[in-house]
């Protein structure tokens, strides 16, 4: 992913998360950084999301296991309940889709094996933040 395109996608995702009531921050760092830092982290309630962000015109994106490891290492530094996510802006459909990662391995995120960001947020609010309400703006 081109750096400028990547930065733009990360900023867009942070903006969406903030509009849904998350505290969200983009971490501007290089993939070569030895520190276990996600592209974005977001919190709501006592839940911490570590997010690897991608943007593509293709129908799939591969995420190397070293990027997944960084998400889990980042989450392990905090006592909050953590979730590792891959968020992909599939530009052909003009939508964000996400995949929650539960184990360390190379991951392929496709249009078909991921869920729309708005659906993930809705499920997140229902399952983890029941008192937060369930109304979502259109993404």
Swiss-Prot record:
Cofactor: Mg(2+)
Reactions accelerated catalytically: Endonucleolytic cleavage at a junction such as a reciprocal single-stranded crossover between two homologous DNA duplexes (Holliday junction)
EC number: 3.1.21.10
MF terms (GO), sorted A to Z: DNA binding; endonuclease activity; metal ion binding
Site-annotated residues for Transition state stabilizer: 54
Annotated Gene3D superfamilies: 3.40.1350.10
EC category: hydrolase
Positions that bind Mg(2+): 10, 39, 52
Pfam families given in the database record: Hjc (PF01870)
One GO term (biological process): DNA recombination
KW Translocase (keyword) present: no
Domain of life: Archaea
Deleted gene: phenotype: Not essential, it can be disrupted. No change in sensitivity to mitomycin C. Double hjc-hje mutants cannot be made, double hje-pina mutants grow more slowly at 55 degrees Celsius (versus 65 or 75 degrees) and do not grow to the same cell density as wild-type.
Assigned keywords, A-Z: DNA damage, DNA recombination, DNA repair, DNA-binding, Endonuclease, Hydrolase, Magnesium, Metal-binding, Nuclease
Function: A structure-specific endonuclease that resolves Holliday junction (HJ) intermediates during genetic recombination. Acts only on 4-way DNA junctions in a sequence non-specific manner; introduces paired nicks in opposing strands 2 bases 3' of the point of strand exchange only on continuous strands of 4-way junction DNA. Cleaves both mobile and immobile junctions.
PANTHER family: HOLLIDAY JUNCTION RESOLVASE HJC
Protein family membership: Belongs to the Holliday junction resolvase Hjc family. Hje subfamily.
Subunit structure: Homodimer.
Additional remarks: A second Holliday junction resolving enzyme, Hjc, probbly with different substrate specificity, exists in this organism.
Protein name: Crossover junction endodeoxyribonuclease Hje
Naturally occurring in which organism (per UniProt): Sulfolobus acidocaldarius (strain ATCC 33909 / DSM 639 / JCM 8929 / NBRC 15157 / NCIMB 11770)
């Amino acid at each position: 992913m081109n750096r400028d395109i990547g930065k733009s996608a990360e900023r867009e995702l942070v903006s969406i998360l903030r509009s849904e009531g998350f505290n969200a921050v983009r971490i501007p760092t290089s993939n070569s950084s030895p520190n276990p830092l996600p592209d974005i982290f977001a919190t709501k309630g006592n839940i911490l999301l570590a997010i690897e962000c991608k943007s593509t015109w293709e129908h799939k994106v591969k995420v190397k296991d070293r990027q997944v490891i960084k998400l889990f290492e980042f989450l392990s530094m905090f006592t909050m309940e953590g979730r590792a996510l891959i968020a992909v802006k599939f530009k052909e459909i003009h939508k964000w889709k996400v995949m929650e990662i539960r184990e360390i391995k190379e991951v392929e995120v496709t249009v078909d094996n991921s869920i729309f960001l708005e659906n993930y947020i809705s499920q997140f609010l229902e399952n983890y933040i029941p008192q937060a309400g369930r109304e979502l703006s259109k993404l």
